[in-house]
Amino acid sequence: MDKSLLYGGLSGVVESCFSHPIDFYKVKYQESVFNGQPRKHMIPFMINQVKTNGFLSLYTGFIPKIVSIIPVRTTFWGVQDICNKNLQIENEMTKYTVSGLVAGFCQTIIETPAEVAKIQMMGHKPSKIVMKNAFNGFRWNAIRNSVFCSAICLSNNYYQKDDKFLKFMVNASSAFVISVVTQPFDFMKTKYQINDHTYKLSFFDAVREYKFKMFSGTFSRAYTGAINMGVGALVFNYLMSY
């Protein structure tokens, strides 16, 4: 077994423990946008959530997340590493971009059903989860993941300095920026997945209907991405160095 597959899964568990509360806030924020409800900033929301429902309520939806994160990050890091070693492409930037595109698409196949379960758990009681549309939002998730993975594959491999803190900052910064860029696709993904029925609105119809609302939850998602990739890449690179 390629060690990158094992270490990729372990890095995913570590990153999720840090980032899940922010991810929970992002989904609840986007849900309030869809429903026309008042929206709260992240810190007041979390304080109120803890006071009302306890600290562990910030980890609602964590079980499907943690169950899925091992194969998801195994794919994310493992496929990148395998592609980087085996793709016969001389230009390194092109090779890392292609590796990221492949890893992102493969990750989406594994991730989407768990994302549907996680998002519906955050918005409804577990008894109301509807999994017949387990691949709702797949195309939007695939676009988002492929672009995101390409950016991280580039930043993690093209930047070859040994300074772990600087590499942490490069990966976290790349994740933050690309999370902002791909936010409209994340909005579409969540819009499809948060509904029990199959949602039919096209991307361009959504742009006309929601306009700047498509960037709701942008910074909470960007913070989540920065934590995930900063911490995840740090753990993965550290383990791979042995």
Regions found by a protein language model. Give the residues of each.
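Matrix-facing interhelical linker segments
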Residues: M1-Y242
